[in-house]
Amino acid sequence: MTLRSDEEIAAARIGPPEIHNSTIYLAPYDPEWSRLFEREERRIRAALSDRALLIEHAGSTSVPGLSAKPIIDIVLAVADTTDELAYVPAMEAAGYVLRIREPDWHQHRLFKGPDTAVNLHVFTIGCTEIERMLFFRDHLRSDEADRTLYENTKQELARRTWKYVQHMPTPNQG
């Protein structure tokens, strides 16, 4: 993930970007995060049924022991993200709000959750970004040294002031 310019952020957003201009709060790991994911997974399955081809808890809240922005990141795979009529109306009826459309980045869509701090990342099944996100999650779950390094880097980056709340860069992205 690279840092985005103001123009790129505005182009991907549905509605105006929310200006943050602050540091990022990282909460200590909370086992409630996995329960919140399970509740959202049930809501998504109820809305999409067999159109939800994959639903996974991703991001820092999915890694036991890791501090995180208290936002549940969920990966949803559908048959084709560009066929929005196949899933967007059902997700909106379930209370989710489509906030980001990124045709130039894996045809990514992002919904915000209805009553929980959720980032629902939607990709087409088979997208390499799904594999990357889940590999990273699984690696952090199994490698304590890398999890500690990642946590320390996140804590350092969280102390910076960020205009937008976006994914913080990895250490080699500055």
Short names for language-model regions:
Residues 22-24, 70-74, 116-118, 136:
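Short amphipathic alpha-helical segments
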Residues 100-154:
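Conserved, surface-exposed functional patches that form binding/active-site neighborhoods
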Residues 29-44, 78-114:
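Metal-dependent nucleotidyltransferase catalytic core
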Residues 25-33, 76-77, 135-140:
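Short histidine-centered catalytic/ligand-binding loop motif
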Residues 43-85:
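Active-site nucleotide-donor binding segment shared across nucleotidyl transfer reactions
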Residues 1-56:
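Helical scaffold of the NTase/Pol beta-like nucleotidyltransferase catalytic core
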Residues 73, 150, 168:
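A residue-level signal for conserved active-site and pocket-lining positions in enzyme catalytic cores
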Residues 159-174:
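Charged phosphate-binding loop/patch that engages nucleotide di/tri-phosphates or the phosphate backbone
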